[in-house]
Amino acid sequence: MRKTTIIAMILGILFPGCKQTPDVVPDEKKFYNHSQFSMGADLSYVNQIIDKGGIYLDSGQTKDPYVIFREYGANTIRFRLWHTPSWTKTVYNPPAANMYNDFSDVKKGILAARSQGMAVCLDFHYSDTWADPGKQVPPAAWNGLTVTLLRDSIYNYTLKTLDKLEAAGAMPEYVQAGNEINPGFVLPQGDRWSKTSDFVFLINGAIKAIRDASASSSIKPKIIIHIAQPENVYAWFEGLAAKGLNDYDIIGFSYYYMWSGIALGNISNHVSLLKNTFNKDVMIMETTYPWTTGNADNYNNIIDESKLIAGYPATREGQYKYMHDLTAEIAAGGGTGIFAWEPAWITSQARDLWGTGSSWDCNTFFDFSGNTIKGIRFMTDKYEIAE
C-alpha cells in the first residue's frame, strides 16, 4: 500500500468530516473475459510480417505481438483461413518457403494466441484468396462442382480443418462461416439473392460441419455469420430464417465508417435492432481508424485524410477516441464484441498482391518504428457491459 494512501486513511479517521481527495488516481484498467465481451484483433498478417523483418516494440523493448495484445486487454484473436493460397509464396522472388494464411500458418497463429490465454476466431473465406462483398470465388479445387458436390466439399473441408485443430489443441472458440458474405459465398452457386435456396443449402453444410466437429470437443465454437456494413445487415438476414438459416449464434458485421452510411453514434441502435429482431448476439468483426495521414513506406495507404470523421482527427488521441466510442456504442446496444482489423500490419518486407510493406500502417496500434501507441489501450477501458 502506498504511503500517501496510509496518510489519507489516518486523516480520514482523525477528521471524519473532511472530504478526501486522493493524491493517486486509481488504476482504471478493466480486463474482460471473451465470454463476456470479445476485445478482439485480427492478427492474420503477423506471422508473415515477423518472417519478413517486422519488429514489434512496447515502451521501446522488442516484444512478441501476441504478448503485447494480451497485456493491453485483447482476449480474442481472429485469423483468416484461405484454402490453397499458393500465390502467397509466388508473390515473392524467389518464392517464399511456405504459404501464409493456409492451415499451417493459421494453426501456428492460433497456438501462439492460445499460449497467451486468448480465445480465437477462425474466419473461413472458402476461397484461395480474399473473399469480400466484391469477390466470393470458390477454391480452384472446387471449380465445376454441382451444388450437391460443392456442399460435400464445404462440409468435408470445414470438418477436416476443425478436427485437425482439435487434435492440435487449437479448436477455436468462434468460427465464421464465410467472410463478408453480402452477395453469398462460393459464387455463382452460393448467391444469396438469386439462388437463395442453394445458398442456404451450402452454408448449412458449413454450419453442420462446425457443429459436428464440436460434438467431441470441450470447446463448442460459436458460429458467426459475417456481413459488411451495418446498413446491409437487417435486409440480408430478413426472411432467411424461413428459408432454413437458423443454426448460428452471432451476427457479425464490418464497420468501416468511410464506406458506411451509418454514423458512429447510431451503431448502438443498429446493434440493438439486430439483437432483438433475430435473437442473436451481435459483434463488429472488423473496424479501423487512422492515427496519422503519413505513410511508413511506398505502398499507398487505403485510408487518407479525406475519409475522417469530424471530431476524430487522424492522431493517436483521435484513433483511441474512435475505438473507445465505438466499443461503448456496441456495449450500449447489447453487443458482445469488437475486432480491430489488422492493427498490427506494420511495414516490413511482406508482400501481397498489390505491393510490399503495408497499405494499413496508418491504422495500426503501432507507430512507424513499431512501438505501441495509445489506440491499443481502448480494450482495458471501463464500459457498461453486462457481467
What feature does the model see in each segment?
Residues I49-Y56, H83-V106, D128-R151, P183-W193, ...:
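Surface-exposed, active-site-proximal loop segments in enzymatic domains
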Residues R2, F15-F31:
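Bacterial Sec-dependent N-terminal signal peptides
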Residues A41, F69, D123, V175, ...:
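Conserved, mostly hydrophobic/aromatic
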Residues Q61-A141, K195-P221, L264-T277:
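Aromatic-lined substrate-binding rim segments of carbohydrate-active enzymes
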Residues L273, T292-D325, E329, G333-G334, ...:
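Aromatic-rich peripheral "rim/lid" segments of glycoside hydrolase catalytic domains that contact
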Residues K63-Y66, D212, S216-K222, E231-K307, ...:
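Glycoside hydrolase catalytic-domain groove-lining segments
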Residues N101-D105, D132-A241, N246, G261-N269, ...:
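Active-site cleft segment of glycoside hydrolase catalytic domains centered on the general acid/base Glu
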Residues V25-I68:
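Boundary/entry segment of secreted carbohydrate-active catalytic domains
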